[in-house]
């Protein structure tokens, strides 16, 4: 079977994940190229507060009608903390391609964020194509922002709030102080 390789699109999946992570205030860096096991490194934006880091492996599927499965090397199962699957949904390439060819089958990308324990539990090493099958699994808690939130919680990153907003009492306002970025209540002048 012949496989198409699209390195720009694969790199785009990594950058898409970086964008989602940074949107949630998670400081994210690309790992060195061809680094086995993980593609991104995530740390707390206030590294002095929390020196923890997480290793993220990014897998992508190009076709909208691709099966919900992805290959993973057994040797790399311990090399990452989270695996992010990006369904790029570029268009139909398989069975539906005859009735609805690419790009007509294109739609918005979907992101799933799986912890290492989930990947290990659903890893199928018995087939020649070592993979994780997601068919018939309930995946809502790992999807899009809910999945990204798992990484933020693990790094103990609070949800971003406005720099100054009224919190219900007329005499207090919520302000962020640099560099800790933790909310502090300050009495408003009258």
Set out the residue ranges of the language-model regions.
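Mixed-charge (Asp/Glu-Lys/Arg
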Residues: 1-36, 41-190
């Amino acid at each position: 079977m012949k496989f198409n390789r699209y390195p720009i699109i694969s790199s785009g999946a990594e950058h898409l994940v970086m964008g989602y992570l940074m949107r949630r205030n998670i400081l994210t860096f690309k790992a060195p190229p061809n680094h086995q096991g993980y593609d991104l490194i995530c740390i707390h934006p206030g590294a002095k507060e929390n020196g923890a880091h997480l290793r993220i492996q990014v897998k992508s599927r190009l076709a909208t009608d691709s099966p919900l499965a992805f290959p993973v090397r057994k040797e790399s199962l311990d090399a990452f903390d989270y695996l992010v699957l990006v369904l790029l949904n570029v268009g139909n390439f398989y069975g539906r391609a005859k009735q609805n060819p690419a790009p007509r089958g294109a739609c918005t990308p979907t992101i799933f964020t799986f912890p290492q324990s989930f990947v290990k539990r659903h890893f199928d090493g018995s087939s020649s194509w070592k993979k994780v099958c997601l068919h018939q699994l309930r995946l809502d808690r790992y999807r899009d922002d809910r999945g990204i939130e798992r990484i933020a919680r693990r790094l103990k990153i609070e949800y971003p709030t406005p720099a100054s907003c009224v919190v219900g009492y007329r005499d207090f306002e919520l302000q962020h102080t640099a560099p800790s970025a933790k909310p502090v209540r300050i009495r408003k002048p009258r």
